[in-house]
Amino acid sequence: MGQRWRVDRRGFLRAGAGAAALAATWPGRASAQGRPIKIGYVSPQTGPLAGFGEADTFVVGGVRKTLGKGLKIRDRVHPVEILVRDSQSDPNRAAEVASRLILSDKIDLMLVASTPETTNPVSDQCEVNGTPAVSSVCPWQPWFLARGGKPDVGFKSTYHFFWGLEDIIGVFIDMWNSVETNKVVGALWPNDGDGNAWGDKERGFPPALAKAGYKVIDPGRYPNLTDDFSSQIATFKREKVEIVTGVPIPPDWTTFWKQAAQQGFRPKVASIGKALLFPRSVEALGDLGDGMSTEVWWTPQHPFKSSLTGASAAAFAAEYTRETKKQWTQPLGFIHALFEVGLDALKRAASVDDKGAIVAAIKATNLNTLVGPISWAKGPVPNVTKTPLVGGQWGRGKDVRFDMTIVSNRSAPNIPTGGKLRPLKQA
């Protein structure tokens, strides 16, 4: 965090598309000065969900550098202020900072990322106040349905791009089918937005897994930051669970997995959402981190480029590592894409002084980004468009302690695999 971005780094802006994108963004001499445009950005930068915000400073710093003196919209150059706020991994705090950005700072556009505990309260504030907003890094069902979204109506000013539960279910089943097990799945679903959506008996994992021939053992919801999972572990052992899945926050998975090892519970597969997205979360498990599997939304191997800079996913991730001395993380690409989408909408809006015009521009988005194509012309419900999802497994790395290998790409064959799912060690 806090590292500087240098857009003149050798090789980062080589792509011709990047040069064209920058020429369209950077002001020319003949452009008149426009009023400042304010963009609010909210994410969890501290607290148990801080891993999602680890790359924020790098991404935001890069966007600021790319914009230079401003964003050219028709014949005017508008200085752009990016107001970054920390949700502190708390829904109430997220709503509070969003309200201040809207009512006190008078932002023109809101960007928000990472888990329902941040995206939902911020999106709700924007919807109530008619503020254009784009969100991501949250499955679409917890974002849309938990906010009271109606498939035949949708929302007025809030839009979202990410994958859905149907995608992660498909990815997990595809990975599990490649390993011989008894098809008994133990579920760790917390009592939060993600856990309740994943465990929903009508729209979540249970009916889909049953249809695929898997038996689900659900010991019930548990509160985040639980320090004793003995009850769940005992249930899984009694029911002969060989696959564990769930969507715990990172510290809870660390607690569960270490206690499971201590108590002799050794499943063949552990496919966990949210908690295993980040290298440092896997490193916290020590040797027990080898073989963990998870959903993968973005990697340096993804075949996409930034519409702002022309940088490929590989170049972007490499620049992050050079600048921060840290391993890439999945939110890196999506946070950048949020700004790609937001700036593109502002450039196309009929008037930046008309919030309705900005909303209309968001709705009309048709943009190839660092995470793939974004267009709300098609989606499972109004205000939602989906991005590709694959499955990956953590293993010993060459230059890093653990590295990600894509092991399932059935739903996105344009993203290459690097191996097959390995069963976890049983001793």
Predicted regions and their residues:
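Extracellular/periplasmic periplasmic-binding protein-like sensory domains
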Residues: 140, 260-336, 348, 407-426
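Beta-alpha junction/loop-to-helix N-cap segments that form part of ligand/metal-binding clefts
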Residues: 51-58, 70-148, 222-229, 254
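N-terminal secretory signal peptides
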Residues: 1-11, 15-20
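Extracytoplasmic ligand/sensor domains, especially the bilobed periplasmic-binding protein
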Residues: 107-219, 269-294
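Solvent-exposed, acidic/polar segments of extracytosolic/periplasmic ligand-binding ectodomains
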Residues: 290, 365-427
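Short, charged, surface-exposed loops that flank catalytic or proteolytic processing sites
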Residues: 347-360
